[in-house]
Amino acid sequence: MQATVHESKQSIMQRILTVFVFTLLIATVGLFIGQFVPVALMLPLSILEVAMIILAFWMRRRKAVGYAFVYTFAFVSGITLFPIVSHYASIAGAYVVLEAFGSTFVIFAVLGTIGAKMKKDLSFLWSFLLVAVLALAVVGIFNIFSPLNSAAMMAYSVIGTIVFSLYILYDLNQIKHRHITEDLIPVMALSLYLDFINLFINLLRFFGILSSDD
């Protein structure tokens, strides 16, 4: 019986990771297409992206997040990611983008493996991580209207890197310890995608500021 449950959890984990990888591929296509999208459309697309995140949280309670929603979100977020990637590539060089992506991949792989194999249930981290993300969001909104200086943005990026690294650890750990049904596969893959992309953005900002200060 235990062996059957273990195999079932392994199967669910593999399917979640497969969907996650597919979202990254779709986001990459969106990133490529982003270079052809008029600047005037970036703000509406960014608003759509935020609206979809909020909608995903609401739909998650009803277990109504489907594959089409996740893939559409990945595509839109890939498009809106282009200006960020382009900005840091232009001021610090393309190698900074590769450095940030490589670091994100390594951190995700290492912490994801640790979280998935850890016997301890990390569900106690949920409230802390939620507060941390909300705080980061508030600071991010403040930065739009009153831009932070380089030192403050560096600190913001470091904190963001820590928070989303912990989210990777937490989410993979919860996939192991929670009873994940098939209808939750899309939303769990979306959670991993958001962890990965936000970690990448924070590392890109960190390396970009570091390189521009040299």
Curated annotation (Swiss-Prot):
Name assigned to this protein: pH-sensitive calcium channel
Reaction catalyzed: Ca(2+)(in) = Ca(2+)(out)
Ways its activity is controlled: The calcium-release activity is mediated by two factors: pH and transmembrane ion gradient. It was proposed, based on an MD simulation, that the conserved aspartyl dyad (Asp-171-Asp-195) regulates Ca(2+) binding, pH sensing, and the channel pore opening and closing, and that protonation of Asp-171 probably weakens its interaction with Arg-60, facilitating the opening of the channel. Another study using nanodiscs suggests that Asp-171 is not a pH sensor regulating the pore dynamics; instead, it is only involved in the gating of calcium ions.
Residue ranges that the UniProt entry lists as topological domain Cytoplasmic: 1-15, 60-66, 118-122, 176-185
Family affiliation: Belongs to the BI1 family.
Pfam families: Bax1-I (PF01027)
GO BP of this protein: calcium ion transport; regulation of proteolysis
Source species: Bacillus subtilis (strain 168)
Residues carrying the site annotation Important for activity: D171
Transmembrane segments: 16-37, 45-59, 67-86, 96-117, 123-146, 152-175, 186-207
Superkingdom per UniProt: Bacteria
Topology in the lipid bilayer: Multi-pass membrane protein
Parts of the chain on the Extracellular side: 38-44, 87-95, 147-151, 208-214
GO-annotated cellular components: membrane; plasma membrane
MF terms in GO: calcium channel activity
Function: Calcium channel that probably plays a role in the regulation of calcium homeostasis. Uptakes calcium ions and mediates calcium flux in proteoliposomes in a pH-dependent manner. When expressed in E.coli in the presence of high extracellular calcium concentrations, shows calcium-leak activity, increasing intracellular calcium concentration. It can also mediate Ca(2+) flux from the endoplamic reticulum (ER) when expressed in permeabilized mammalian cells. Calcium transport activity is also detected in ER-like lipid vesicles.
